[in-house]
C-alpha cells in the first residue's frame, strides 16, 4: 500500500472514531438528561387543598394596576392552571464573557410549576459535528450547570445551593411569561406596586424568598424582567451583576398569550452584555385537571 493510501486509511479511521465518540457522548448525555427529568418529576408536589385549578379573574382584586392589566391581556377567565410545560427553542448563545462569539443552539426544556423547577438541555454548535452539550437546571431546590464538548469533555460542572440555586430559580421565575398562571397570587406569588408600568413579584421556594422587577408595555404585556444581582461566572470567579430578560412576539398558545422570542443580558458597568437570544419552536402544556 502506498504512503498516500496509508494516510487516507488513517484519516478514514480517525473520522470513524470521531463519529463513534460523538455518538457515545450524545448517548451518555441523553441518559443524564433523562435522569435529571426523572428527578424533576419526582420533586413535584401536589397543590395545597383548596388551591384553584382554574384562573378566576376575581383574584386580581387588590393587585397593582399593571399586574391586573397583564393578567387580563394574557389569560381568559376559567383558563386551566399550567402544571408543566415542554419548550423547544432555536437561537444563538454568546460563548465569550468579554467579546462577541455567537454560536447557534437548539434546546428542549422541561418545566414543572410545583415544586418550581426546570431542565434545559441544549446543543450549541461550536464546530461542525462537535456540539457543546449544556444542562442548565433547577431541581428540588438545587441549581445545576453542566457543559461538555461532545457530551464528554467537561467545560463547566456546577451543582448545589447558594447563589447557583438562587440564579436558576431567577431563571424559572423570569421565564414564567411562558407559563403565566404560575404568576398568579393563588399560585403563591406576591405582587408589590412600583409605578404604572412595573411591579415587583416575590416567589418563595424553600426558605429564601426571591424578588424580581417586572415591566409591562402599553398593551399590558410583560416586556422585561430584572434582578438587581445574579451570580455571573467569569473564569473561575463568581461576581454579582444586574441581569435582565426581554420578551416579545406574543402569540396565543392553548388559550395563553405568551412571548415566543426573548433575549437575556447582563447589565454591566461598561454596558449591556446580551448572551442569549432565542425563539420558541414548539410549546406544549400540561394542565391541572
Question: Where are the language model's segments positioned?
Answer:
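N-terminal mature ectodomain segment of secretory-pathway/periplasmic proteins
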Residues: 68-153
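N-terminal leader/targeting segments and the immediate start of mature chains
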Residues: 29-86
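Gly/Pro-enriched, hydrophobic low-complexity segments
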Residues: 200-287
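N-terminal type II signal-anchor transmembrane helix
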Residues: 2-35
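Flexible, processing/modification-adjacent segments and terminal tails
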Residues: 146-205, 238
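Short, surface-exposed beta-strand-loop junctions and turns on beta-sheet-rich folds
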Residues: 127, 151-154, 230-232, 266
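Short, positively charged
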Residues: 64, 192-196, 226-232
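Short, solvent-exposed coil/turn segments at beta-strand boundaries
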Residues: 82, 108-120, 133-146, 194-198, ...
Amino acid at each position: 500500500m502506498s504512503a498516500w493510501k496509508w494516510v487516507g486509511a488513517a484519516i478514514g479511521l480517525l473520522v470513524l472514531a470521531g463519529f463513534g465518540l460523538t455518538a457515545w457522548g450524545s448517548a451518555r448525555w441523553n441518559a443524564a438528561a433523562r435522569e435529571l427529568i426523572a428527578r424533576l418529576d419526582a420533586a413535584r408536589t401536589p397543590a395545597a387543598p383548596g388551591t384553584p385549578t382554574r384562573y378566576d379573574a376575581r383574584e386580581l382584586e387588590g393587585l397593582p394596576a399593571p399586574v391586573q392589566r397583564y393578567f387580563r391581556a394574557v389569560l381568559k377567565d376559567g383558563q386551566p392552571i399550567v402544571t408543566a410545560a415542554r419548550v423547544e427553542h432555536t437561537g444563538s448563545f454568546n460563548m465569550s464573557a468579554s467579546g462577541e462569539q455567537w454560536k447557534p443552539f437548539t434546546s428542549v426544556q422541561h418545566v414543572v410549576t410545583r415544586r418550581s423547577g426546570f431542565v434545559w438541555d441544549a446543543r450549541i454548535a461550536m464546530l461542525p459535528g462537535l456540539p457543546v452539550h449544556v444542562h442548565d437546571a433547577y431541581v428540588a431546590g438545587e441549581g445545576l450547570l453542566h457543559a461538555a464538548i461532545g457530551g464528554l469533555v467537561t467545560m463547566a460542572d456546577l451543582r448545589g445551593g447558594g447563589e447557583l440555586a438562587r440564579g436558576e430559580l431567577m431563571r424559572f421565575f423570569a421565564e414564567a411569561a411562558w407559563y403565566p398562571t404560575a404568576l398568579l397570587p393563588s399560585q403563591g406569588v406576591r405582587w408589590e406596586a412600583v409605578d404604572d408600568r412595573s411591579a415587583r413579584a416575590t416567589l418563595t421556594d424553600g426558605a429564601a424568598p426571591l424578588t424580581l422587577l417586572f415591566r409591562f408595555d402599553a398593551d399590558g404585556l410583560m416586556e422585561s424582567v430584572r434582578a438587581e444581582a445574579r451570580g455571573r461566572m467569569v473564569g473561575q470567579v463568581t461576581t454579582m451583576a444586574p441581569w435582565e430578560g426581554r420578551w416579545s412576539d406574543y402569540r396565543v398558545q392553548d388559550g395563553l398569550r405568551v412571548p415566543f422570542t426573548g433575549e437575556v443580558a447582563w447589565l454591566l458597568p461598561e454596558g449591556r452584555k446580551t448572551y442569549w437570544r432565542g425563539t420558541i419552536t414548539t410549546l406544549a402544556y400540561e394542565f391541572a385537571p
